[in-house]
Structure formats: C-alpha cells, structure tokens
Amino acid sequence: MKPGEIIVKRTEIEVNRGHNATILDVKNTGDRPIQVGSHYHFFEANPALQFEREKAYGKRLDIPAGAAVRFEPGDEKEVQLVEYSGKRRIFGFHGEVNGPIDEARVYKAEDDDSATEIIAEENKVSENANKESGYNR
C-alpha cells in the first residue's frame, strides 16, 4: 500500500437505485453534434433532439454525475431517464420551468405540426434568474 492510496471493493456501483426510470428513443435532427449532461433537465434539451418530450418532464439522464451523452447529427439512441429527487424544483436551463416540477403544468400540443410539447403559457414562471445577468441576447 502506498501513502494516500485508496483501495476500493471490486463491485459494480449502482447509480440512481430506486429511482423510477423512463426509456426514450432520441434522434438528433440537427446538423451539429448535441451533448446533454448528467443533470440537465432532458425536457428542455436542444429542440433539434426529437423524442417524446412530455415523458422527459422532471427527468434527467440516468448516468453518473459529470458524464454526458453525445448525439451526432442523424444519431438515434435509446436513453434512460430518472426523476429528479430532493425538493423537485428546477431553475435555469431554458427557463421553461423555473419552479416546482409539477406534471400538471405540462401538456402535449394537439396538432401534429408542432415540433415540441411545451409548458402551458399560464403555468410558466416569468421570473428567470438568467435575465438579470449581464448577458444580452
């Protein structure tokens, strides 16, 4: 044994054990690679990613913290998502939630022409912490 050495058991580490999982097929319809990190609210991921968006509400990728999944243009992958835990409040990302995760706030667009499902306008939170930064679009 060397000074400072850590010896760990040779067993698999179970990530997100006990969380409800959702499996989705995702396709990158864009012309650029898209990478989604481990704790990104998948519902708010890049609009060029085509998937059943309403099923991703309140969920993140079921991968180790700090990891990411990369979608090259035209890639189709199956991903597993798990629900956020804790206080179940989301702020930031694309600013579509900015508050508690409440499935009643989401609906699927009725017409087939719509590319994505959205949070009903009356349920959106207008205060976005990102708007107060020095960043102007």
Swiss-Prot record:
**Entry's Gene Ontology cellular component terms:** urease complex
Which EC number applies?
3.5.1.5
Origin: domain of life: Bacteria
List the keywords (alphabetical): Cytoplasm, Hydrolase
Q: Map out region (Disordered) in residue numbers.
A: 118-137
Q: Which reaction does it catalyse?
A: urea + 2 H2O + H(+) = hydrogencarbonate + 2 NH4(+)
Q: Known PANTHER family for this protein? A: UREASE
Name of the featured protein: Urease subunit beta
Organism for this UniProt entry: Staphylococcus xylosus
Q: What is the lineage of its organism?
A: Bacteria, Bacillati, Bacillota, Bacilli, Bacillales
